[in-house]
Amino acid sequence: MSMHGKFFPSLIGILLFFWSMPFLMADIVVRFPTENTALLDNRPQDFYMYVDRNFEGKKSQPWEAGAYGFTRTLVRTQAGPVAVKFHEGIDIKPLRRDASGTPLDDVHPVAGGTVVHASANPTHSNYGRYVVIEHQLADGPLYSLYAHLASVSCKEGDRVGTGNVIGKLGYSGVGLNKTRAHVHLELCLKLQDDFENWYSSLKLGTPNRHGAYNGLNLAGFDPAPALMQCKDGAEFSLSRHISSLPVQYVVRAPSTGSLPNLVKRYPFLLKPGPANPKSWEISFTGTGVPVSVTPSDQPCTEPSVIRAVPHPFSQLYRTCNRVSGSS
């Protein structure tokens, strides 16, 4: 393949690892956060909230755009129309509304855990009002995020279970209206503990009001497979699920002489290799979820992309603009 191997600054934050010890807890059964379980009945059109699309003069309301992945913003390429905008989560439709069309659905945690962030000011994030819950699993911490809430009924530090209400489904945040009200759900790995220092180095001119639970610091994977497991009461294994995700590109980063902190948080990511590596090779999905970390005896002075899966169009379209080049 032909590619520049350029490593974009936004990805460098993923490689800034900080101390966090794993917690030895049990796996969980992931539950749906609202009464809408249409996905279990093979009715995705009744589960995912559509977006209003106008592509080349043709208007549509595809429910697929409410699913996880590269599902939004079509562009025409030599390979045909390609959705290039990443949607880091799933948008779940409401089931109940009052006479004015305002949704009435309660939002519950997908599993028991601790509220680590509750942002009740809708102007502080594109998420609008949102809540983040930490779930301690055998493989390390899992984070669930619930966004665009009409109201928040929990606070940081609360211990919650699936029977608790953490908020109301709504349409707070950017680009939403009452008709398209939904709850945006993410399941995530946390990338850094000292996110604030990295964020400050970007000099974006806007304060980080969300600490380590800013969306930039949470690498979200598709929640749908985890939700589908609950039909049979199957437990969700974080390590098994992450290990099954497809790798899109691999980054080599210099070793600092100690185990990367991401590996300390998620030990299952570590693969066999030299005991005293000169660098680390981190495999990522196209959406930026780390899948594995492998010790390497190859020296390097700065992070760089060393491999990427070929595509018939720009790598930018399948790596959230993190990797340049094409196949």
Where are these predicted regions, by residue range?
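Zn2+-dependent peptidoglycan hydrolase active-site motif and core
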Residues: 102-104, 108-151, 178-180, 184
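Bacterial N-terminal signal peptides
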Residues: 11-22
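Short glycine/threonine/proline-enriched tight-turn/helix- or strand-capping micro-motif at secondary-structure
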Residues: 63-108
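Bacterial N-terminal signal peptides that target proteins for export
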Residues: 1-11
